């Protein structure tokens, strides 16, 4: 999935913070009504969105879409930032649509 950003509009940030997890932490299962950006600072985060599993390490980030389930699938310890936001400024594109957009 690719996203285009309309820079004339700003996202509405509803919640953001820095989190340091305890050892053997697993991210809880949830479905958000907002976009979420995770930025991993240290350690590893084992995160699943729907059927896709990701191993995030220091310097990695992931952008989660609203309405999709996400959860941890393996215990770990990490430090990360998270930003929850609502936005009308983003448009999602499936990978097969990219050639049409480029024309």
Regions found by a protein language model. Give the residues of each.
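N-terminal regulatory/effector-sensing and dimerization cores
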Residues: 12-100
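A short, N-terminal "cap"/entry segment at the start of jelly-roll beta-barrel domains
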Residues: 1-12
């Amino acid at each position: 999935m690719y996203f285009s950003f309309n820079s004339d509009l700003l996202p509405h940030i509803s919640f953001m913070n820095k989190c340091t997890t305890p050892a053997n932490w697993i991210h809880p299962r949830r479905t958000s009504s907002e976009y979420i950006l995770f930025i991993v600072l240290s350690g590893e985060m084992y995160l699943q969105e729907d059927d896709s599993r990701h191993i995030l390490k220091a310097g990695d980030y992931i952008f989660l879409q609203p309405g999709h389930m996400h959860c941890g699938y393996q215990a770990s310890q990490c430090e990360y930032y998270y930003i929850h936001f609502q936005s009308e400024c983003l448009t999602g594109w499936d990978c097969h649509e990219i050639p049409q957009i480029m024309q």
